[in-house]
Amino acid sequence: MSETDFEYMFFLGCIAPNRYPGIESATYKALDKLGIQLHPFEQASCCPAPGVFGSFDLMTWLTIAARNIVMAEQADLDILTICNGCYGSLFEANHILQDNENARNKVNEVLSKHGLEYTGKSRVRHLTEVLYFDYGTEKIAERVERPLDINVAVHYGCHYLKPTDVKHIESSEVPKSLDGLVEAIGAKSIYYKDKNMCCGAGGGVRARNPEVALEMAETKVKNIIAAGGDCVTEVCPFCHLQFDRGQIEMKETFGREYKLPVIHYAQLLGMAMGMTPKEVALDLHFIPADPLLEKLGINME
């Protein structure tokens, strides 16, 4: 694929623009440097979260998701997401509607009242999937201006690779894509205990039982620190929130303090391509990235 083939409707989701706008801006800036063109959704809604909407009414979830997908269809583009939850919701809704004519007809009956029709011609893609499998780590490495000589703990999250009956991207037990992307920018992807464990944010756990959610996140943070990780990188703003804001909540709830920097891959990529930490908004995180920047010899500005 040539770089001219990389053009997408960019689905932001809710958490990035509302809680971590730096992830949004870093994605635009970093992908622009790679020659990947992103078009903003003009009237996107929540993806919506299937664990919330779908648990109450499956057709409502499918219809809202379909409306988002239709906007990409109208632009004749695929969707790119930077959030595992948005990816999971839109991908799975797309899969159901493509394969289930009855569901598709019911959804289109509602959409037709607004002059819309779902056809199923647009794909839903994840940032990690596109960068690793389509764009390629060799091309990314060629764009690196500042190799990041740090130990990075990769967190894949749950909804990027699961459920495996509909997502056939790579092994959900031994994934390699995000590790490869980290290595492409000069960093070392380290192994740590329970690497594939959930961060605790999803499935309604953070909302319903926050202490259990924090215990899950704390387990991962402790394992990463024990393995010598300089930071944790993820590809989901909700996971990012769980690790970043979560460390503040761990101190408030358990009285235990951690200072593990949390950085979305788009932010790491941007820094490796010469952007300052402030340009990728590391200064807006709850957990300061100072120890990481000191190791890299980079100033915030």
Swiss-Prot record:
List the InterPro entries: CoB/CoM_hetero-S_Rdtase_bsu, Cys_rich_dom, HdrB/HdrD_reductase
Q: What protein does this entry describe?
A: H(2)/formate:CoB-CoM heterodisulfide,ferredoxin reductase subunit B1
What reaction is this protein's catalytic activity?
coenzyme B + coenzyme M + 2 reduced [2Fe-2S]-[ferredoxin] + 2 H(+) = coenzyme M-coenzyme B heterodisulfide + 2 H2 + 2 oxidized [2Fe-2S]-[ferredoxin]; coenzyme B + coenzyme M + 2 reduced [2Fe-2S]-[ferredoxin] + 2 CO2 = coenzyme M-coenzyme B heterodisulfide + 2 formate + 2 oxidized [2Fe-2S]-[ferredoxin]
Q: Source gene?
A: hdrB1
GO biological process: one example: methanogenesis
The record's function comment reads:
Part of a complex that catalyzes the reversible reduction of CoM-S-S-CoB to the thiol-coenzymes H-S-CoM (coenzyme M) and H-S-CoB (coenzyme B).
Origin organism is: Methanococcus maripaludis (strain DSM 14266 / JCM 13030 / NBRC 101832 / S2 / LL)
Q: Which UniProt keywords apply?
A: Methanogenesis, Oxidoreductase
Q: What is its EC number?
A: 1.8.98.5, 1.8.98.6
Would I find Nuclease among this entry's keywords? no
What's a Gene Ontology MF term here? Answer: CoB--CoM heterodisulfide reductase activity
Query: What Gene3D superfamilies is this protein classified in?
Result: 1.20.1050.140, 3.40.50.11810
Q: Determine the domain of life of the protein's source.
A: Archaea
